[in-house]
């Protein structure tokens, strides 16, 4: 089911991004490069930013057709919250015409709030406290430790993607890998 949503969102993104990127370029929604950065980054000045809008919209709309219950909707909402953090981070960069949006502390705080809300929801309303140990097939009941565990997984996954992401559309490959992880 989630694989269908992933395939549809990939197709929509592949069709929509070639329209969105030139539009963002015309709006001058481009990346600002620091003067004290590496010399080879100078040529990347003005590279369109906020391309994640198309990806987040495509994933959200495609996923909405496959929601089975409120739990799926809450999981999707968590992803949208993380996407909004990225959107506003990029938006601040564009408005300030500087490469600094949120500070690392601000971004991490917002991500922590989103992951905490999702983890608490899973613990209190779904009653989920077990996790599957990869390659062993065993389930471990973490009890209340499920909350920080879920937070750690969400924060580690999203920030790994953020750290890997660059300026030249690397997020699409990283994003697809992360999406496959969440579909599993």
Model-derived regions, located:
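"…together with the soluble PPM/PP2C metallo-phosphatase catalytic core" -> "…together
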Residues: 1-184
